[in-house]
């Protein structure tokens, strides 16, 4: 049985429960200190789903409620002396997804009624904006303290219909109405914190709150949610060591595998390395490294976005966009890239300060393989993603150094899906091979680039390395010649493994591989 280091808060987003029940908590309260020292009044934070936004919102609620006992030993305990108890209204809109007009209005009404009951009065108002205004004023008058408003997942009611104008407009009007009092309530408000995934600029939150601080892409707040590399290798080092022991790995090997699967998020130009907290905590709790975040569901709005912009699976990686692209409201976007970034499927890998452009890539192996598996049925037979089908068969034969058998399997597979290819041209051919070899990366290391050139694919096995070069209506001889002339094998000659080079040709008339050459060095 694995060594138990900590209790992990799997699925727990309530600060009070985590602290009282002794679950692992990575201290983020220094960011609250920062808010207070800078006298920030309105703060907006965008982060992907399941990335810790709700836990931070819950932490803020406990702080402003003066729950001093929950913060013992944390950074803010040394800063805060007064622990003033403010009225806090915490509105969680994550439950307002997939709703029509009447459902959304009822949801808002129920939230407000719950707070009205707590404050002991029944309103005569019907409109949500007037009820919110009365609620804040009533709390201020009763306590003599300014009010804190926390709106978690503010955009949840809108994301699913972002590409459906006839459905988006009425829902947006409802939410615009609900948020509209915030500006006029300024004299009664101590602090307002809003979280979401993207920025709907036409909502009153952004158009009227001139002093709203959007901290989403500020370097100093890059680790406000998620778990930084520093936090993992200091506060959580025993947890990583215990997971490694359970998996038969050293600490260094386990850290490298966690990094490969869950690290890689960057939310600003000089961002810290951030790990996905949902997957990381799940892995530590289960003693198993697996695609937990991606497996928890791909939002329908993301699939619709990819379809709307006809995104090809090969076009997602290493794309550049301007700084201004991140400030575009989703219903006004002309590209899928900003929403892919905001949703956590792409992240910042490089920033060019002269051109003010970001290079976006997949953050890690979990997201890349998950995205490819989601998109692959558009190009491949769905059954090809099963362990017993192409990828599994191909890798098994390579493991046994049966390269001929692997190529025969690949040829038969390509012939079987030829009718699924949309244009049956070189672009389709490239896309299929891109998917096949990248999906192999779910099981082992697949490399495309080297310092001296680019092979189509390099597959690593425990005892062998396989370098593939693929031609379209060319020849296998031409492919082998390119491997030799470009020196694609050179980086692997010192590994002490068997080295195979495979040159293959795809015949567009046969719609499969027509011939190949296999050579072992």
What is the role of each PLM region?
Residues 139-143, 436-462:
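Active-site metal-binding core of divalent-cation-utilizing nuclease and nuclease-like domains
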Residues 148, 464-466, 500:
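Structural motif
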Residues 491, 497-521:
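Domain-level recognition of nuclease-like catalytic cores that cleave nucleotide substrates
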Residues 169-173, 472-489:
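Mg2+/Mn2+-dependent nuclease catalytic core
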Residues 1-425, 440:
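Phosphate-binding site recognition
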Residues 178-185, 338-346, 434-439, 483-502:
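Metal-dependent nuclease catalytic cores in nucleic-acid-processing enzymes
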